[in-house]
Amino acid sequence: MKMASTRCKLARYLEDLEDVDLKKFKMHLEDYPPQKGCISLPRGQTEKADHVDLATLMIDFNGEEKAWAMAVWIFAAINRRDLYEKAKRDEPKWGSDNARVSNPTVICQEDSIEEEWMGLLEYLSRISICKKKKDYCKKYRKYVRSRFQCIEDRNARLGESVSLNKRYTRLRLIKEHRSQQEREHELLAIGKTKTWESPVSPIKMELLFDPDDEHSEPVHTVVFQGAAGIGKTILARKIMLDWASGTLYQDRFDYLFYIHCREVSLVTQRSLGDLIMSCCPDPNPPIRKIVSKPSRILFLMDGFDELQGAFDEHIGPLCTDWQKAERGDILLSSLIRKKLLPEASLLITTRPVALEKLQHLLDHPRHVEILGFSEAKRKEYFFKYFSDEAQARAAFSLIQENEVLFTMCFIPLVCWIVCTGLKQQMESGKSLAQTSKTTTAVYTFFLSSLLQPRGGSQEHRLCAHLWGLCSLAADGIWNQKILFEESDLRNHGLQKADVSAFLRMNLFQKEVDCEKFYSFIHMTFQEFFAAMYYLLEEEKEGRTNVPGSCLKLPSRDVTVLLENYGKFEKGYLIFVVRFLFGLVNQERTCYLEKKLSCKISQQIRLELLKWIEVKAKAKKLQIQPSQLELFYCLYEMQEEDFVQRAMDYFPKIEINLSTRMDHVVSSFCIENCHRVESLSLGFLHNMPKEEEEEEKEGRHLDMVQCVLPGSHAACSHRLVNSHLTSSFCRGLFSVLSTSQSLTELDLSDNSLGDPGMRVLCETLQHPDCNIRRLWLGRCGLSHECCFDISLVLSSNQKLVELDLSDNALGDFGIRLLCVGLKHLLCNLKKLWLVSCCLTSACCQDLASVLSTSRSLTRLYVGENALGDAGVAILCEKAKNPQCNLQKLGLVNSGLTSACCSALSSVLSTNQNLTHLYLRGNTLGDKGIKLLCEGLLHPDCKLQVLELDNCNLTSHCCWDLSTLLTSSQSLRKLSLGNNDLGDLGVMMFCEVLKQQSCLLQNLGLSEMYFNYETKSALETLQEEKPELTIVFEPSW
């Protein structure tokens, strides 16, 4: 009965609700706060329910007591105080067995109804504020989705755009933080830096702000660095869209604000509140509520490198108040330095040229480098760009055949330009084969297709417009200016009508949020036109300013540009100079003159060649990365005669290669270098995990990273790679058979591998190959290439020096190698086999070489587990009178005193042996005693003996002292890292004073000697100045 009574009572209350209030009541039933311990009712069941059905549903879902409490709470929520008070007074008496609703605000009997009503209103007010905040979040997300869901298609008609999600192609991101030295240049690799020992780590967008491990703090600042056109802005926009779409950072950020740095720099003063307001859809956003939780805000600052003159070390007081108006640079600096909303997170995009400046402002940032498109993603981009699948397939196949162009397409901007050109040529039936080999060629074709005059007066007007564009670009480059006002355009002879035409032709883009400001479609286009500034012949020669303008134009003297090139090696001039080389190609010059009806000067060619000659003689380009950067300039030119003349100035080439583009460029230049005498090539490579996956899927991996210099990729030298391709090796190594002067080749520290080695060996067997010294340490070789090397040894009589250290050749590989070493035509004199995974099993083969080879004089087999047995085998053959071995290296070979008798017998019989290296073997005092027997033999001619770290004590010093007074040949004795003690050293001091001791160099451990020993050593050096005592650090 009670159940029916409660349901009837509740139904009567609901019956008093008018239709509007009843709808509100049902809405609150659906959104009833779960923390109040009641189950909300599904909309499908309440939508058509009348007051009786609704009361029944409430009781069925929650029981009588909770249903009544829900009704009372909702009466207050819909502002029906009359029903609220009446229901409170009419509340049934619940039995003790019923579970009470633990909500003192709603059903607490101790408080008066008035107090309860006021408390409930306050609670509902808070709920309403939260709801409004959530409502605004939803509104803001909707606005961000609409703003960022489309991107302008630079090929499209005015007003047309494409879907960002449909066009976006995933970019490769790696978690990197490199030093200034590594970021000096995208081609820089000093010495033998082993970047392959530190593989790069890929990172996904959703993990950008996650800690590195469970013990680390969350990341609050992320820096996206990458070259021009690599996709920084498109990636930033994609992050905005994904967040607004609910697929990214939902649990971390309530608001993401996109800040275009160059736009902020144009505004005189504004507050952070103003900046946030400019990002919002309406003029009155709840800014105070937004900034009240800064940890829930992410500021996405795009284009830090585009700030004009900002972030000086002495910028002045920083801003800490979000309501205070400041200059744009101060505002951004305050955010970046965490003075303004320090709990907020930042995501900053920049070109590497500004990275050092930015780094000083940041505290523990996460650096993420954008590597562009992988091969698979390049293919994906083509298929997204071309709506017709057949066209996409044909275009991609064509590009794949052109390795250079295909490599360049890892840069999204270049990929877009190539696709645009291909589409235009497909539509006109032309071929892209010869117009897309270099960056200059691609840009030349693309821009000339847009700037074709229609004849008559339009030709003259086009030339004037082109000159204006070039002078504007050059003036901007020299002043590091990328945004131009209408007054700038007028100063360079460009009118509004001209700009509108260029807008349609996409040479300029009008800034959406910055009226009356213009910029080149991309920095590289500005650099291209700046290069043309030095080549276009004006109608009025010698003009230095525009008529009607007081503007002073940059000097057109190319020598001024080239002189400043070195000073701006991390700046904008590098690519201008590259374009300059590319544009003076004679065929390209004729093409441009025909297409643009403008005259282009050829005088600059001689100046460029003279500049190279001067720099070469001054040795300015012998230091990396300038030498490789020069190769890029020459490659852009694509004229073999010019390149050959330029390369004649560089007999010695030392470069480190990171990208396939590096390979192609260097191969082109080296092939045209006929006077090179020494060639040293290093290869840097790392493979992110995602690239390894692509390799497993059978995709051909490219070494892709920025080929743009300075502002384009000054820091990007640690790049991804698999093994060097055979095609590249053939191209590069072909120079070995054509250059008569090239005698040295250093390929140490690269991933040449067996396939590459096979190609190299084919070249080394060529009769015109003059290589005498070949270094192949750490090249990833195995026993599989040893047969090919053996063929070289048995046929190439010019090769006299070979280093194969740090390659896992193994015993079987040495067996194959020894076949060539024993050949009558083999003239090899020096052989390094250090750390080649050898054991005593290979010693029989090596021993046979020692007894048969007439040329081998130096053999280094240290860092291999040869052991006493292996060395005993070598010694047996080394005693042969026909053995010409002069230097033998057995460092860290696992030797003990057991092999010393065999070594001693070699010393007493082989008068050719002058150097013996035994460091790192536990010979002990007993071993030295045995060794000294051979050393004291009259026929022993040993000059250098290294016994560092051989477990020696003072007990061996008597034998060694005897040796020092008796030996007529020994000049250097190294005893470092042995505990000889004061007694042993004092014994040496006495012996070394004697005139019969001819030793010139003594190596001892750097250890604490007593006062007497120190005095004796000082006295010895004073009395015998010809003796050098070297104190080596103890290990």
Curated annotation (Swiss-Prot):
Belongs to the NLRP family. GO terms for biological process: detection of biotic stimulus; inflammatory response; innate immune response; negative regulation of non-canonical NF-kappaB signal transduction; NLRP3 inflammasome complex assembly; positive regulation of inflammatory response; positive regulation of interleukin-1 beta production; positive regulation of interleukin-4 production. Keywords: Activator, Amyloidosis, ATP-binding, Cytoplasm, Cytoskeleton, Disulfide bond, Endoplasmic reticulum, Golgi apparatus, Hydrolase, Immunity, Inflammasome, Inflammatory response, Innate immunity, Isopeptide bond, Leucine-rich repeat, Lipoprotein, Membrane, Mitochondrion, Nucleotide-binding, Nucleus, Palmitate, Phosphoprotein, Repeat, Secreted, Transcription, Transcription regulation, Ubl conjugation. A motif (KFERQ-like motif 1) lies at residues 355-359. This is NACHT, LRR and PYD domains-containing protein 3. ATP binds at T169, G226, A227, A228, G229, I230, G231, K232, T233, H522. It comes from Macaca mulatta. It is an enzyme of class 3 (hydrolase). The lineage of its organism: Eukaryota, Metazoa, Chordata, Craniata, Vertebrata.
